[in-house]
């Protein structure tokens, strides 16, 4: 079982959504990224080059959220997961994109999608929701 690195609660303004008002006004998205990676070398060597740089993770994730508008947060989550999986040291990733200001007329606390990718079956392959 691999170690885990987590980036939780990254808040970035974006213009994603199907409705014109979402794209015109924008809204805050909250993103959680969990990646499974062997951190033994990083721990032993105390060297940033031996781990996944979480500053880069936050910056690239924020750039995707703030970047070109997408209709679906499923697409946004997939783009984040795919760039994380570009690093061959990563065994798997889970990306949660929260859209707490979604245009839903009923009162709600959150709406989110969870995108998971794993090396099982090849780069960027989807894995079942039951676990990594």
Swiss-Prot record:
<dbReference type="GO" id="GO:0005737">
    <property type="term" value="C:cytoplasm"/>
</dbReference>
<keyword id="KW-0289">Folate biosynthesis</keyword>
<dbReference type="GO" id="GO:0004150">
    <property type="term" value="F:dihydroneopterin aldolase activity"/>
</dbReference>
<comment type="pathway">
    <text>Cofactor biosynthesis; tetrahydrofolate biosynthesis; 2-amino-4-hydroxy-6-hydroxymethyl-7,8-dihydropteridine diphosphate from 7,8-dihydroneopterin triphosphate: step 3/4.</text>
</comment>
<feature type="binding site">
    <location>
        <begin position="73"/>
        <end position="74"/>
    </location>
    <ligand>
        <name>substrate</name>
    </ligand>
</feature>
<dbReference type="Pfam" id="PF02152">
    <property type="entry name" value="FolB"/>
</dbReference>
<comment type="similarity">
    <text>Belongs to the DHNA family.</text>
</comment>
<feature type="active site" description="Proton donor/acceptor">
    <location>
        <position position="99"/>
    </location>
</feature>
<dbReference type="InterPro" id="IPR006156">
    <property type="entry name" value="Dihydroneopterin_aldolase"/>
</dbReference>
<comment type="function">
    <text>Catalyzes the conversion of 7,8-dihydroneopterin to 6-hydroxymethyl-7,8-dihydropterin, 7,8-dihydromonapterin and 7,8-dihydroxanthopterin, respectively, in equal quantities. After longer incubation times the only product is 6-hydroxymethyl-7,8-dihydropterin.</text>
</comment>
<protein>
    <recommendedName>
        <fullName>Dihydroneopterin aldolase</fullName>
        <ecNumber>4.1.2.25</ecNumber>
        <ecNumber>5.1.99.8</ecNumber>
        <ecNumber>1.13.11.81</ecNumber>
    </recommendedName>
</protein>
<feature type="binding site">
    <location>
        <position position="54"/>
    </location>
    <ligand>
        <name>substrate</name>
    </ligand>
</feature>
<keyword id="KW-0456">Lyase</keyword>
<keyword id="KW-0560">Oxidoreductase</keyword>
<feature type="binding site">
    <location>
        <position position="22"/>
    </location>
    <ligand>
        <name>substrate</name>
    </ligand>
</feature>
<dbReference type="GO" id="GO:0016853">
    <property type="term" value="F:isomerase activity"/>
</dbReference>
<dbReference type="InterPro" id="IPR043133">
    <property type="entry name" value="GTP-CH-I_C/QueF"/>
</dbReference>
<dbReference type="GO" id="GO:0016491">
    <property type="term" value="F:oxidoreductase activity"/>
</dbReference>
<dbReference type="GO" id="GO:0046656">
    <property type="term" value="P:folic acid biosynthetic process"/>
</dbReference>
<keyword id="KW-0413">Isomerase</keyword>
<dbReference type="GO" id="GO:0046654">
    <property type="term" value="P:tetrahydrofolate biosynthetic process"/>
</dbReference>
<dbReference type="InterPro" id="IPR006157">
    <property type="entry name" value="FolB_dom"/>
</dbReference>
């Amino acid at each position: 079982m691999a170690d885990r690195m987590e980036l939780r609660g990254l808040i970035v303004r974006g213009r994603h959504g199907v409705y014109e008002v979402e794209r015109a006004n924008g809204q805050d998205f909250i993103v959680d990224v969990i990646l499974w990676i062997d951190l033994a070398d990083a721990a032993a060597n105390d060297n940033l080059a031996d781990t996944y740089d979480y500053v880069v993770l936050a910056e690239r994730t924020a750039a995707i959220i703030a970047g070109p508008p997408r209709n679906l947060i499923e697409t946004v989550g997939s783009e984040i997961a795919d760039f994380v999986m570009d690093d061959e040291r990563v065994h798997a990733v889970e990306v949660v994109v929260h859209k707490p200001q979604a245009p839903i007329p009923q009162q709600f606390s959150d709406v989110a999608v969870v995108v998971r990718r794993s090396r099982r079956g090849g780069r960027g392959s989807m894995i079942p929701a039951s676990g990594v």
